[in-house]
């Protein structure tokens, strides 16, 4: 299971990195948002050594507040810097290859439609970064998927972070559509007061309507109020052919309807084949 995924993600781009003050602004946001924040280093402007140096300085600045460091695409840098996660973009390394380079950290995939979301789930990505949800200057002319993209990405049960044109005013509708959290570039990094901007985003996020849990070692999110029986139904499994272990305790079939799932629960589903 990955550690509790932050709900607010501050993502850099080449412009933000080129402007400087990434460490200082990241530190200010981390002081305001703590473990609810992840700082993503996403840039093609820095070579490996320079990116690693920046990643380590950001990690030193945000870690005391419980904030995540996330590195995009460069699993080697993520591992060396002690990042909490690595995100593979369009055309990037497969999840299994990222895990080979950076074992023990969360692996996410950028997705842009229902097909890429399903592919990322099949690969075993821990969470998805879905976008662009709204029109954004960082990807002009790329279009936007809106809440429908979020719903499609969340349909498979992975936690979804929505990115693209995000503002505090838009965040609520995206969470209602099924996102776990939101990511922003300009609304955070370009703010006159990054700490205040981070607080504004967090204040705008309604309580999530999904429950994060682990099923057979993989992170998933299910609708709030789901029971063990409901989980089996969502997965298309017949309770008569599955042994269900909930937080290391076997649950009888006739009790599955009465066991609600809570955040952080661990579920093991063991298929068996009868014979005669």
Which residues does each predicted region cover?
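Ubiquitin-like/PB1-type beta-grasp interaction modules and other compact soluble beta-rich domains
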Residues: 209-275
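Non-cysteine beta-strand/loop elements that form the S-adenosyl-L-methionine
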Residues: 126-133
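Conserved N-terminal beta1-alpha1 strand-loop-helix module at the mouth
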Residues: 1-95, 100-126, 142-145, 157-160, ...
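Short beta-strand and adjacent tight-turn residues that come in two discontinuous sequence segments
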Residues: 88, 130, 184
């Amino acid at each position: 299971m990955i550690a509790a995924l932050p709900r607010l993600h501050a993502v850099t781009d080449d412009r933000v990195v080129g402007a400087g003050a990434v460490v200082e602004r990241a530190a200010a946001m981390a002081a305001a948002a703590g473990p609810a924040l992840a700082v993503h280093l996403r840039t093609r402007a820095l070579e490996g050594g320079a990116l690693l140096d920046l990643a380590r300085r950001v990690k030193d600045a945000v870690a005391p507040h419980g904030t995540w460091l996330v590195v995009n695409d460069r699993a080697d840098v993520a591992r060396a810097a002690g990042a909490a996660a690595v995100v593979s973009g369009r055309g990037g390394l497969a999840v299994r290859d990222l895990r080979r380079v950076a074992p023990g950290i969360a692996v996410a995939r950028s997705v842009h439609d229902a097909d890429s979301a399903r592919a990322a789930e099949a690969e075993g990505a821990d969470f998805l970064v879905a976008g662009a949800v709204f029109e954004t200057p960082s990807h002009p002319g790329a279009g936007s998927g809106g809440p429908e993209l979020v719903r499609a990405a969340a349909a498979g049960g992975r936690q979804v972070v929505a990115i693209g044109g995000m503002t505090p005013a838009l965040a609520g509708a995206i969470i209602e559509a099924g996102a776990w959290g939101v990511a922003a570039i300009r609304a955070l990094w370009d703010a006159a007061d990054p700490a205040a901007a981070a607080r504004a985003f967090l204040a705008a996020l309604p309580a999530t309507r999904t429950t994060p849990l682990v099923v057979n070692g993989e992170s998933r999110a299910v609708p709030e109020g789901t029971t063990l029986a409901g989980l089996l139904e969502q997965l298309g499994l017949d309770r008569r052919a599955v042994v269900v272990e909930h937080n290391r305790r076997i649950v009888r079939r006739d009790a599955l309807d009465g066991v609600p799932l809570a955040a952080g629960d661990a579920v093991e589903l063991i298929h068996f084949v009868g014979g005669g």
